[in-house]
Amino acid sequence: AIGTRPVNFHLDALKKLGAKIVLKNGYIEASAKKLIGTNINFEGITVTGTENIMMAATLAEGRTIIKNAAKEPEIIDLANMLVSMGAKINGAGNDTIIIDGVNNWTGTEFDIPADRIEAGTYLTAATVTKGEIKIEGINPERLMKVIEKLKTAGATISYTSSSISLNMKREYPNPVNITTAPFPDFPTDMQA
């Protein structure tokens, strides 16, 4: 496990939008007749909290401004999908996101980008097993800190705009110090 993942940021922000939150027998019940846009200032960076509020705010009445928003690529991906469904979102990928509520979403087709944590896990597995791997359909810009650390460990890595190739010829990887932090730094979920 990665550790506790409190949901208070999510719940507090949903309450600010007008949701009624009830904690009952270990479950969270959220309801709202109508959500109203507001200013949300997250006390700490939360990827899923940012995503949850983005989705809720797109259907809220008025404008919602999210400050101290997460900047991970998944935030941009979600914003792009929601915009393709009719949402009005500006600033995804920055620490301030502005959302103007709409009445409804429409259907869409959207290509889901490769999971950078999954790709990083396979690259790491190849590094520690003296392996060789090529991952296609992944944007290496989303994994630059992971690539940097795996090179320090001794892996030979090359990449294009949509693939990463790794070859570990060393018998044992070099030791590597890792400090996790929000994107673009080394992802917390890669430490598990």
Q: What feature does the model see in each segment?
A:
Residues A1-A192:
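Structural preference for solvent-exposed beta-strand-turn elements
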